[in-house]
Amino acid sequence: FRDGTLLTLLRNSVIIALLATLISTVVGTMAAVGIHSMKGRLRSAVMTITNIPMTNPDIVTGVALALLFAFAGTVLKTNSVLGFWTLLIAHITFDLPYVILNVMPKLQQMDKDLVEAALDLGCTPFQSFTKVVIHEIMPGIISGALMAFTMSLDDFVISYFVTGSSFITL
């Protein structure tokens, strides 16, 4: 802990992991709720697309995102597009499936009558969502957030491909 450069790199890694975890947990939870309400083939197709980042090797995802960001830099006519924001977007993309797949089982286990009971007792739909649904799926949200943080902090390959020289992590 005496090397200042190493501490800066550790700080950068933790910042990216925390931000990616926070954003992917919120977005992933909302996505899981949306996917849970879908039916049939649409739900199956969305779940298949959700699993792609998990089934792809990290190097394929890293190269694909690097090409996407390079193309975006060409279109936007910016020289150094790779950096903090591209790394954050890549980590969010990488973390989202883990959050969704941790929240989905809790949504499937939840008793649907609880929401209707809350509505019957005078809650608004927003109140029933925040007080009943979120409360019921909280273990899935927490496990998804922990999984996202761990995966984001552990990831090297994707970070290597999508980070420019302006923002370096461990």
Range-by-range predicted roles:
Residues 121-122, 135:
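Glycine/proline-centered hinge or cleavage motifs at structural transition points of membrane proteins
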Residues 87, 168-170:
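Hydrophobic alpha-helical transmembrane segments of polytopic membrane proteins
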Residues 35, 117-118:
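Short loop immediately C-terminal to the Walker-B catalytic DE motif
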Residues 40, 124-128, 164-167:
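Gly/Pro- and small hydrophobic-enriched strand-loop and loop-to-helix capping segments
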